[in-house]
Swiss-Prot record:
Its cofactor is Mg(2+). Binds 1 Mg(2+) ion per subunit. This is Methyltransferase LUC1. The gene is LUC1. The keyword Cytoplasm does not apply. GO terms for molecular function: metal ion binding; methyltransferase activity. InterPro entries: MeTrfase_7, MeTrfase_capping, SAM-dependent_MTases_sf.
Length: 361
């Protein structure tokens, strides 16, 4: 594999595609709102800003669709005054969509309810680097992003690849917390949520993963997709366990106080919609099941599609055009929906998340 293949430089799908298919992330975000409220109360109580603006940084904003409610929750618990809201993501992110999302929201705020003077900013930088100046932030948060690794560790003879990913995930989270400790003032807070391994042993959205895998195998078997492309497809994530996270926190205890660290499952809301449809008079089970398959597969593809397009380039040494790659992708999506409907009809799409609330000492 070429060195460029190890770099995690693939953004979520742009032009609003990711933001249109981030419903499960939205469910996880809602579960993080009480932590953000508590974190904001801690900041308001602990931090003497000396007339400087309150600064809030989001690490991994994507298109901003799941950034707004957290920011509203923070504003709700913050006294009137100047507040800087920083939205950050990798340089490859679709910042045009993010800008539209943030600007539309900020300009439409009810000034009677939110008399704050709001100063939005966007920073194109990975959260595995320092994002804002040292001791300039009061509150930080990152939702549904930290399971994405900085890069894919290169294979080592005699070392299990999962062990390499586990080590990389440990180093990444440790680096993330050390960087945020530089940026966030003493008394400040940090709230995190990210995809995790369920302590029950249940695999996250197993049916979807199986359908994706079978669809790609099907494309290779019938000669549609080169095997080298399928072999190059990889999503550089690692789902940590609670124990993994606690080990990292133990290493930063002199700098951070951990107030809450817990695991919780999130169900894709399309399943609730499906159950509601079953009670309607004009319920068509086949149509409803196909629509459910469309929604949950589109959700997963909003994250995976960019990595698939990268695999087409890497696995073919750039012999395919962008149009070719998009055709491969459309075929893969179509087949994945077919396999999910056939083999996992109406199956729950559940994902485990870890939630963390930290205070900067």
């Amino acid at each position: 594999m070429a060195d460029t293949a190890h770099i995690n430089d693939v953004p979520m799908q742009g032009k609003g595609l990711y933001s249109s298919h981030a419903a499960l992330q939205h469910e996880a975000m809602l579960k993080a709102l009480p932590l953000l409220q508590q974190a904001t109360n801690t900041v308001v109580t602990n931090v003497n800003r000396n007339l400087r603006p309150l600064t809030v940084v989001e690490y991994g904003s994507a298109h901003g669709n799941n950034s707004i409610q957290p920011m509203v929750t923070i504003l709700d618990s913050t006294p009137p005054g100047d507040i800087q809201l920083v939205f950050s993501d990798r340089p490859e992110n679709d910042f045009n969509t993010l800008s539209t999302t943030v600007t539309t929201w900020a300009e439409g705020l009810d000034k009677a309810k939110f008399p704050h003077s709001i100063f939005p900013a966007m920073i194109p930088r990975s959260f595995y680097r320092q994002v804002v100046p040292s001791r300039s932030a009061d509150l930080g948060f990152s939702l549904a992003a930290l399971h994405h690794l900085d890069h894919v560790p290169k294979s080592q003879d005699g070392v299990d690849h999962q062990a390499l990913l586990k080590r990389q995930a440990h180093l990444d989270l440790l680096q993330f917390l050390k960087l945020r400790a530089d940026e966030i003032v003493p008394g400040g807070s940090l709230v995190l949520s990210f995809v995790s391994q369920s302590s029950s042993g249940r695999e996250n959205y197993a049916g979807l993963v199986d359908a994706c895998r079978n669809a790609m195998i099907d494309m290779v078997k019938d000669g549609t997709l080169p095997g080298a492309v399928a072999g190059s497809f990889y999503v550089p994530t690692y789902n940590r366990t609670l124990q993994d996270v606690q080990k990292v926190i133990e290493e930063v205890i002199p700098t951070w106080i951990a107030h809450e660290v817990f695991e919780q499952d999130c169900l894709h809301p399309a399943k609730k919609d499906l159950e509601l449809q079953k009670s309607s008079d004009d319920y068509d089970s086949d149509e409803a099941s196909r629509r459910y398959a469309d929604v949950v597969v589109d959700w997963l593809m909003a994250v995976c599609a960019g990595y698939f397009l990268k695999a087409v380039k890497v696995g073919s040494d750039n012999t395919f055009t962008g149009e070719d790659a998009e055709k491969f992708l459309a075929d893969w999506v179509k087949r994945t929906k077919h396999f999910f409907y056939k083999d996992h009809r109406d199956e729950d799409v559940v994902c485990s998340f870890i939630f963390v609330r930290l205070e900067r000492v």
